[in-house]
């Protein structure tokens, strides 16, 4: 129903601004030659398409329950993340919270993790957090999706009914795949079906490929 592929310009997250938001010792932030930032406790560094935050002093705490983990994650993210991009919690486990970017009231996924935030914490606090290094900025263009570019929901449901354990399927959502074009320095949001299988969202395309090849399905299919 009038689905489109939407293209946006992208920009890097402001690391200095992020560091000032999340570090406790804001007057003691140091930057190394490889752009690693620290206040003597937490460490913030770019790595591929992601930004990695670690706090080694918090690693040895005890595991917290899922509800506590979500609360801790959201409180921490409000310090400096989420300013220009909306996210929602899609996975809540003991000590691990995963949030996906949202777009047009749906969930965004990416093969390189650039549409998700993963937060790991314990009784000592957040000790590792990975987040996107680049965010979409200005709308550029849209292209109508072809009739056969995406499966009909009836086909998706019928395929799942025939080929997977339905008790492992918690949700079916029409989301978006976030895809980067390095040469143009843009990103596109492409409509696609996603299945929540064994507590993790996977693309229907990836799940179908795995099933058709006779591979065993597991939580980490992307």
Describe every region a protein language model picked out.
Residues 124-128, 132-222:
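Extracytoplasmic/luminal low-complexity segments enriched in Pro/Gly and acidic/polar residues
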Residues 75-80, 117-120, 163:
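Structured segments of extracytoplasmic/periplasmic soluble domains
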Residues 19, 66-69, 73, 92, ...:
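A sequence-composition feature that detects small, non-aromatic residues
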Residues 61, 65, 69-72, 118-123, ...:
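Surface-exposed acidic loop/strand-edge motifs in secreted or periplasmic proteins
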Residues 34-56, 96-139, 196-215:
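Amphipathic N-proximal alpha-helical interface segments
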Residues 21-31, 116-117, 147, 211-215:
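Generic alpha-helical propensity signal that fires on short helical segments
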Residues 1-87, 91-96, 100-108:
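Preferential activation on post-signal-peptide N-terminal prodomains/segments
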